[in-house]
């Protein structure tokens, strides 16, 4: 199957009438180094960016960065009238990680993100593009508030599976509600696998330990096909999350302040996100139930009159007016 970078090929957009993909202001560790030079110069001229230094932009709060990205999107709508515009807002994720979901801070962050969406809608209307525009608002996950952290690496260290130096025979990498365990010594991998399962099977806070034969059902690759995939997948119980800590005394840590976490299995209803679609090609008021995130990109491609033949997802036809654009 093709890599992810090929699933939404540039030709899909060009066939739909896009003239360029050169306007880019990415969310990357060095964000000011990578935008299109023309766009970066214009944003500096508008006072949205101070200079060409990453440090100046990164000194802004998460809320201020979202404001800058939204203003850049409004500028592009006004001056470029793009065929496709993608905007990533960070404030809801940042705040809920720090303060937990369903808190005053979380609701304030949601209100701010909603205001930015309103800015986009108003820019579309001011540009005279309302009848030609579809707006999709989607989030990639929900949030839960854990009360304890499980530290698998502490267990591994105490069992002799982690020793000083670069070679650690077992290393857990947390994704919040799940964690990958990498078994890094080929000569002892199967013995280490059995040992890890034995050590963690009855550990507080761990709901399940999944081996590669269970990965496909979760849309995960097997380690032999993708070296970035772990050899085992740990699943946290309700109220727990994983950490990467290796040097704590205890393998369980009490959380004494509100925080938020995600990365739990998609079967956890708290992981459900948001999906809203409005505008050109969208039926008013359909009852969709739970929408799969893998269906979002094929649906957007369908609105552009294109197909993504290698994508795992499908077009959400109950959402769209027929016939689809060509």
Language model features with spans:
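Active-site His/acidic residue clusters
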Residues: 19, 71-119, 187-188
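Loop/turn elements at helix/coil->beta-strand transitions in domains of secreted/extracellular proteins
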Residues: 80-85, 130-134, 205-206, 228-230
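Formylglycine-dependent
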Residues: 14-71
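Acidic/histidine-rich catalytic neighborhood
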Residues: 132, 139-184
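Soluble non-cytosolic domains of exported or imported proteins
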Residues: 60-67, 104-111, 190, 287-294, ...
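Short, small-residue-biased leader/transition segments that mark boundaries at the very start
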Residues: 1-13
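Metal-dependent active-site segment of extracytoplasmic phospho-/sulfohydrolases and closely related
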Residues: 111-156, 300
